[in-house]
């Protein structure tokens, strides 16, 4: 199984690489540019200790997709907040107002010229119990 790894990409798959042909640069008389690796383990690591094949830059399409997803999420949150605010304006929290409360009926509307009898009627008879002696 031959696994060609080109020198321009600069990436290698971690694991066993056997009989790989690595082409680097232009072949000339002094440097043929072709190097054959047999039965070795090639793991390219950076200073972080993470194999370089795991390190992937985002392509433009992926960045565009991420931005699109973030914007769609923000738009969804904005619409949710706007919907909740609109519902609060349509049906506010029940605060009892004396002019709006339906408990006060309209049958009590009297002429303001008539005097309203707001006091209690006077007591007609007062019985005082005397203790039996």
From Swiss-Prot:
Q: Which residues are glycosylated?
A: 1, 6, 11, 13, 19, 21, 23, 30-31, 39, 41, 48
What's one Pfam family the UniProt record gives for this protein? Glycophorin_A
Keywords attached to this entry? Glycoprotein, Membrane, Sialic acid, Transmembrane, Transmembrane helix
Does the keyword Protein transport belong to this entry?
no
The principal localisation class reads membrane
Q: Where in the cell is it found?
A: Membrane
Show the stretches that span the lipid bilayer.
63-85
Q: Which residues lie on this side of the membrane: Cytoplasmic?
A: 86-133
- What is the similarity comment for this entry? Belongs to the glycophorin-A family.
Its function, per the record, reads: Component of the ankyrin-1 complex, a multiprotein complex involved in the stability and shape of the erythrocyte membrane. Glycophorin A is the major intrinsic membrane protein of the erythrocyte. The N-terminal glycosylated segment, which lies outside the erythrocyte membrane, has MN blood group receptors. Appears to be important for the function of SLC4A1 and is required for high activity of SLC4A1. May be involved in translocation of SLC4A1 to the plasma membrane.
State how it assembles: Homodimer. Component of the ankyrin-1 complex in the erythrocyte, composed of ANK1, RHCE, RHAG, SLC4A1, EPB42, GYPA, GYPB and AQP1. Interacts with SLC4A1; a GYPA monomer is bound at each end of the SLC4A1 dimer forming a heterotetramer.
Q: What is this protein called?
A: Glycophorin-A
Organism encoding this protein: Sus scrofa
